[in-house]
Amino acid sequence: MKANVRDASNVRIVDLSGKMTLGGGDVVVRDTVSNLLKEGHKQIILNLSNVNYIDSAGIGELVACKKRAAAAGGDVRLLLPSESVYKVLSIVSLHLVFQIFEEEAQAIGSF
């Protein structure tokens, strides 16, 4: 998994690509979000448009990132999950936990 961080006003957008799985993608997401929080960036959007697979470790890391951001006074929101990733998120009811957006501008404006 690869992560690229972009700045959009006071929001950091993390463009993720690849598989969010145990021992790979979950570590990339954890490290990227942790570094952003350490730098004081509390409003984070994870762009999932190029994530083609997520397993239980990836799901767990999404929840952990949201909790870490909330503890720092921020939030993590999701952008453009693929149909297969959205299906997994909805099966485990994370579509009720995360704000999920189809448009980047809406996600940015939600903060």
PLM regions with names:
Residues 1, 108-111:
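Short hydrophobic/aromatic patches at helix-to-coil boundaries
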Residues 1-15, 35:
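Short beta-strand/loop segment at the start of cytosolic alpha/beta domains
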Residues 12, 106-109:
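A short acidic, often aromatic-flanked loop/helix-cap motif at beta-alpha or helix-coil junctions
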Residues 20-98:
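Amphipathic alpha-helical interaction surfaces in cytosolic regulatory modules
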Residues 83, 105-106:
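Acidic phosphotransfer microenvironment of two-component signaling modules
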Residues 99-103:
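Short acidic-hydrophobic, aromatic-tinged amphipathic segments that line or gate anion-handling sites
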